Amino acid sequence: MASEKVETVVAGNYLEMEREEEGSKSTSGKLSRLFWHGGSVYDAWFSCASNQVAQVLLTLPYSFSQLGMLSGIIFQLFYGLMGSWTAYLISVLYVEYRTRKEREKVDFRNHVIQWFEVLDGLLGKHWRNLGLFFNCTFLLFGSVIQLIACASNIYYINDNLDKRTWTYIFGACCATTVFIPSFHNYRMWSFLGLVMTTYTAWYMTIASLTHGQAEGVTHTGPAKLVLYFTGATNILYTFGGHAVTVEIMHAMWKPQKFKMIYLIATLYVLTLTLPSASAVYWAFGDQLLTHSNALSLLPRSGFRDTAVILMLIHQFITFGFACTPLYFVWEKFIGVHETKSLFKRALARLPVVIPIWFLAIIFPFFGPINSTVGSLLVSFTVYIIPALAHMVTFASAPAREVIRSCT
């Protein structure tokens, strides 16, 4: 029964998105379409892959030192596949919601559908409130982490200023993301972001193998249960990037083609995370327990400085990915979401950036935040809630009656 319903949904048409694509081809300049106006399957893949791994690429070797090599590899594979599965469930729910609304003649040309709206339309206000709380809190702290990470990374190549001062500077830089209207406009940034993480991952791999094992290196593995689960939550956070799946899907010309994109993106990301984390842990072993950022152990060189700079730029991109859904929520709350004035929307978004900037300044450490976000917020936001929502949405009639009686 559920599979038949899903098939019907996948066959749905997204007429206004197709009209928008045609309009874009006829009115936008070639440069605008090339660098700014994306909505293809490839754009969605670049967005998913680029957003999935950022600062955590540098902390995964630290997680390996807490977990041990074998557990680190197993957790990456497990959470990667689980994340791909729940991203698929989210895509099915989005398509179901979108199809129902289009049958009611709802026009989404000036409105970005978000996860909490999908839950509201399919399951009601209690699910909406649950999704809104966890998603917004997760994205809020995800944005804070990116600002803190910027200051932490730049310190490796320029320590003339303290980390808090660098947070002031990068907060101002990241505030410019208020001028990026939606995920349609991340085409160039998503592509560059993936190039940057690819370079950094392979630099870490090659530099570690070239360096060889440090003198007296040991690989103790999990010494304490707390450390073991701390390492696991960091990997959980790594593959929990599909909190923005709905927004990425909505930016596609044909969202029904999203189904396998996240899985393919995850497989590519694993080709970056597994070799880099394994190589750095092999080279430095237990030294990583006191060096959460892998770049701090690699010898300084032009290649390392390049990796630092590229990761700084990538964190700007990731900040935009995490913050843009928060911008949308705020725009809808104050009633400016559907306005066509980019300047008005940018001004309206500034109150979202300021508290994030403030939190990054007063909490200049991202390790504990990573663990908290991974263990609680990611678990519910991108694993538990989507799985439960899918089961309830496509439950049989008797099962739905039982659920109603319980709620």
Show the residue positions of the predicted features.
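Membrane-interface "cap" regions at the ends of multi-pass membrane proteins
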Residues: 1-62, 66, 83-88, 110-112
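Hydrophobic alpha-helical transmembrane segments
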Residues: 63, 176-181, 358-364
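Central hydrophobic cores of alpha-helical transmembrane segments in multi-pass inner-membrane proteins
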Residues: 55, 80-92, 171-179
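Alpha-helical transmembrane segments and their membrane-interface exit regions
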Residues: 82-85, 174, 197-200, 378-385
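Membrane-interfacial loop- and helix-cap regions that link adjacent transmembrane helices
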Residues: 3-10, 36-37, 92-139, 144-167, ...
